[in-house]
Amino acid sequence: MALRGVSVQLLSRVPGLRVFRTWVSSAAQTEKVGRTQSQLAKSSRPEFDWRDPLVLEEQLTTDEILIRDTFRTYCQERLMPRILLANRNEVFHREIISQMGELGVLGPTIKGYGCAGVSSVAYGLLARELERVDSGYRSAMSVQSPLVMHPIYAYGSEEQRQKYLPRLAKGELLGCFGLTEPNSGSDPSSMETRARYNSSNKSYTLNGTKTWITNSPMADLFVVWARCEDGRIRGFLLEKGMRGLSAPRIQGKFSLRASATGMIIMDGVEVPEENMLPGASSLGGSFGCLNNGRYGIAWGVLGASEFCLHTARQYALDRMQFGVPLARNQLIQKKLADMLTEITLGLHACLQLGRLKDQDKAAPEMVSLLKRNNCGKALDIARQARDMLGGNGISDEYHVIRHAMNLEAVNTYEGTHDIHALILGRAITGIQAFTASK
């Protein structure tokens, strides 16, 4: 079921209590009334469900639940069976993007241009389900949606939107986002990629190198950020096959192995003037993309965390040592309680942030807070789960070690844990601490 044109039939709730009338003596009736009141009092007492501790489900719309459940089925039936070998062999299957396009989950918050136009919370739920399988798969979707489709939608011309967005939404085109460079990571203002304007043929010549670029080896469209002659940083749309453009693969990764990662090398690439994004003329454009990407990450890592929690819990229940299940051990229960607490708080914070985003009330610092917190906690949870599985924890057949290795990268990209601390520190004190001289 695709997300486009989702229609939901609301079902009326059937009362859970049915009263049966019987002919009984008054004494028996009094006794029965007493028992019934006692049972009602007991049944009305709130029950704690560890799978949804603060009842997140009741705070989602019917559409959001349907979207999540539909995508969950796809992720578990189509992606989970292939991730083990994909990770072992360091392979990303291009058809996954096409399948996501058929489902309508690419650029899902964009309205029009073949996109679903769903809520920010719905997008977060999609990221959560996808990263429950693998962070590399979620990374591919995150790049396609917030980092490629968003800048075209937000900063592009109408001609650019019409040309690229429908094909990106269908998964016909795969995009990548080029900002990080070999000598420019956490400080993108120091980028060395240059764009020189050619007035004779109204084009730009781009020279430079981008690195650690998700999707680049397989990309059809490259959103690249470069410094122009006036000192401003602008975004450009490069297409596969342009002369001087190459995207070699980075191999030997121990993290995000099921994601295609590479470089973007531009050696005198001539780009038509109409391929420049007219609505972005500073780093603020790229930061706007990253802000949306970080939001999806904050949701996604909790999906990986939930997988680790559920796996560790089941292992602790099944594994017998000293004649009892590991789950009987107080230390094990304490670790599970810590995991559950952090996941629950993170999910409800993400829900609140998603609602604020849809009201245009989400400050970038809010996103930094959750990207930093949730990634750090998710990494801790994965490491803890790995430890709880003992020697089995390092086997990829249990998947936990894969999540732990993936989250090392996720905790780093789109703003490291410490960079987001400095963003928050600046908001708290009013003093920027990124450099000593400013």
UniProtKB/Swiss-Prot annotation:
Chief location category: mitochondrion
Coiled coil: none
Pathway of action: Amino-acid metabolism; lysine degradation; Amino-acid metabolism; tryptophan metabolism
Location of the protein in the cell: Mitochondrion matrix
A Pfam family per the record: Acyl-CoA_dh_M
Chain segment of the transit peptide: 1-44
KW Acetylation (keyword) present: yes
SUPFAM superfamilies: Acyl-CoA dehydrogenase C-terminal domain-like (SSF47203), Acyl-CoA dehydrogenase NM domain-like (SSF56645)
Co-factor(s): FAD
Keywords: Acetylation, FAD, Flavoprotein, Mitochondrion, Oxidoreductase, Transit peptide
InterPro entries: Acyl-CoA_DH_CS (IPR006089), Acyl-CoA_Oxase/DH_mid-dom (IPR006091), Acyl-CoA_Oxase/DH_mid-dom_sf (IPR046373), AcylCo_DH-like_C (IPR036250), AcylCo_DH/oxidase_C (IPR009075), AcylCoA_DH/ox_N (IPR013786), AcylCoA_DH/ox_N_sf (IPR037069), AcylCoA_DH/oxidase_NM_dom_sf (IPR009100)
UniProt-listed PROSITE patterns: ACYL_COA_DH_1, ACYL_COA_DH_2
Disulfide bond positions: none
GO biological process: fatty acid beta-oxidation using acyl-CoA dehydrogenase; fatty-acyl-CoA biosynthetic process; L-tryptophan metabolic process
Reactions the enzyme catalyzes: glutaryl-CoA + oxidized [electron-transfer flavoprotein] + 2 H(+) = (2E)-butenoyl-CoA + reduced [electron-transfer flavoprotein] + CO2
Binding-site residues, FAD: 177-186, 212-214, 319, 330, 387-391, 416-418, 434
N6-acetyllysine: residues carrying this PTM: K240
Active site residues according to the UniProt entry: E414 (proton acceptor)
Family as reported in the entry's similarity comment: Belongs to the acyl-CoA dehydrogenase family.
Name by which UniProt lists this protein: Glutaryl-CoA dehydrogenase, mitochondrial
